[in-house]
Amino acid sequence: MRSNQAGITLTEVTIVMVLAAIVTVGLVTFYVNSQATWMDASTQALAQRDATLVIEQIATETRTAYVAKVSPDAAGNPMLVLYDIGNDEFARFWWNEKGDSLIHRGEGNPSKDLGAIAVTKVDEFQVDSNDTLVFVRPLRMHSTTGQPVEMTSSMALYNR
């Protein structure tokens, strides 16, 4: 072999390719894991937003109510019915467990379903009331990736 020859050997090329492959696999793995983490966090944030929306909708209507009554619906789930000072029903909230598994708002008797408040599936909805307060404990939802979200709240009947 002559001493003035320049170039790289097959062994050197193989080593460089193996190192490049290891770096590429590491970068792809990091990207995929980051993407999965972002998706989980994003869907959980959406579920939290929907749970907050449901609680805020119930609270807004409850604050204007004179009387709040909780009774079981046809499926045995608690249904919150709100009445004004003239004892006229103006809002009701229920969990459609057997149907779309969402919290619905309605009004009137018999209830006119105004549709679901939010689109995140509900696992549990418990509501109770006394003379001056309405308690939601708990409202349990799950994100599309299965992350649980749970909220509880108490709200006052300010129109008493």
Give each language-model segment a name.
Residues 4-59, 63:
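Aliphatic-rich helix starts adjacent to a transmembrane/signal segment
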Residues 138-147:
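Short, exposed beta-strand-loop hairpins at the edges of beta-sheets
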Residues 148-160:
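Edge beta-strand at a domain terminus
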